[in-house]
Structure formats: structure tokens, C-alpha cells
Amino acid sequence: MRIVDTHCHLDFDTFSEDLEKIIDRARNVGVTKMITISTKLSNFPSLLNIASKYDGVSCSIGVHPHEAGREGQTELSDILKYTSHPKVVGIGETGLDYYYDTSNSK
């Protein structure tokens, strides 16, 4: 069976020391593709670097709603200019996040 992990955060500090081993372990259990999801535009270069380094790894570009206040004003054009890169396969994180009940609906 082939598995696609459509939502991982390979750029998080938790994985930095063992990233290659983590990706190898995932491949050994059938994960053939991974999409590492952007939470901040400021971290996007790191995501793109990871996606470019590893076959089968792609990335998204976006700003998680909980990070939006810390990231400053983000224009759609700031995001769209990267979408033509072959390793960028989506836009996200985006939207409203009520999972942790910390997002202001207004």
C-alpha cells in the first residue's frame, strides 16, 4: 500500500536533528509522498529547502491563523508569487481555526 501524508510539519524544531531518519522511517512503512505545511511565511524558505532536498516531499505556503498576528500584514500576492515553484503544491495553512478555541471569530 502507498501512503501520502498530506499534512506534516517537517520544519518544526522537534524534527530538525533527525529529519533524514524520520523521512526514511516513513518511507519504510509505505509513505511515498509528504506535504509539509507552512504555518508562517517567515519559515517558508526552510520548507522549500526541505522539499527540494527530499524526493517525494512537497510543501505548501501560507500563514496559520494563530500566527497571523505575529507575521504582520500578509497580502495574497506575497503567497501567490511562490505557487509556480514545482515543489509548492498548495496554499495553507489558512482560514479560521476553532479547534483550540483560541481564534477570534471577528
Where are these regions (language model features)?
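Mid-domain alpha/beta scaffold segments of enzyme catalytic cores
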Residues: 1-106
